[in-house]
Design a protein with these regions (language model features):
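Structural recognition of an alpha-helix C-terminal capping motif at a helix-to-coil junction
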Residues: 48-55, 68-80
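Sigma70-family region 2
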Residues: 14-15, 38-41, 52-69, 88-90
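Arg/Lys-rich amphipathic alpha helix in sigma70-family domain 2
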Residues: 59-66, 76-97, 120
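DNA-recognition helix of helix-turn-helix
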Residues: 79, 83, 87, 126, ...
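Internal acidic/polar
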Residues: 2-3, 92-120
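Short, charged helix-capping/linker segments at alpha-helix termini
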Residues: 2, 14-23, 33-52, 163, ...
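Short amphipathic alpha-helical boundary/capping segments
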Residues: 8-12, 126-134
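Amphipathic, Lys/Arg- and hydrophobic-enriched alpha-helical face
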Residues: 25-43, 60, 131, 176, ...
């Protein structure tokens, strides 16, 4: 799977052949759900937001510019979907608690070494909690760079900066994440 293939599929979609979008959906659905889960902290909403992202891809397919990789365009739309979702959630007064889903995931794992799973779950929960305490832009940056592994050159335009400035922002975001993670770990053990 190359960005040329993705761009070709989107080029066909721009002309009305929507079969390509189905292929792109299958190819990137998991990545989008993961992106939303990591940024928002709730897996169930990730599925809905991934579908909304692809709905917008279909709706705005004519605005796709083949000079930019499809994946970067898709994640820019995903960022917009996430921002819209967070605005609606804040207006509705909904509170997000990622710990509920983590406990459901642990309960669904049969025949596992319970103590190892609990320890892994605690570290995972600390990381999720630390990530959730960062500002949205820093969470998105970490998820796109470290979890989705998009190239810096594709991410920089999403944040309106150069690759060098993006690296500085990522360094600072990771440093802040580490500080929050250590802080949370200290609170948990003290």
């Amino acid at each position: 799977m190359t960005s040329d293939d993705d761009n070709e599929l989107m080029g066909r979609a721009r002309k009305g052949d929507l079969d390509g979008i189905g292929i792109l959906f299958e190819r990137y659905h998991g990545s989008l759900v993961g992106f939303f889960r990591r940024v928002d902290g709730r897996g169930k909403i990730g599925e809905d937001l991934a579908q909304e992202t692809f709905w917008r891809i279909v709706r705005y397919r004519k605005s796709f510019d083949g000079r930019r990789p499809f994946r970067a365009w898709m994640f820019q739309i995903a960022r917009n979907v996430m921002n819209d979702h967070l605005r609606k959630s804040m207006r509705a007064g909904k509170v997000m608690d990622p710990r509920v889903e983590l406990n459901e995931e642990l309960a669904a794992q049969p025949d596992s070494d319970v103590s190892a799973e609990v320890e892994r779950g605690e570290r995972k929960e600390l990381l999720r909690e630390a990530l959730s305490r960062l500002p949205l832009e820093k969470r998105e940056l970490i998820v796109l760079c470290r979890f989705e592994e998009l190239p810096y050159a594709e991410i920089a335009p999403m944040f309106g900066c150069s690759v060098g400035a993006l690296k500085v922002r990522l360094f600072r975001a990771l440093k802040e994440l580490k500080e929050v993670f250590i802080q949370l770990g200290g609170e948990k053990t003290a």
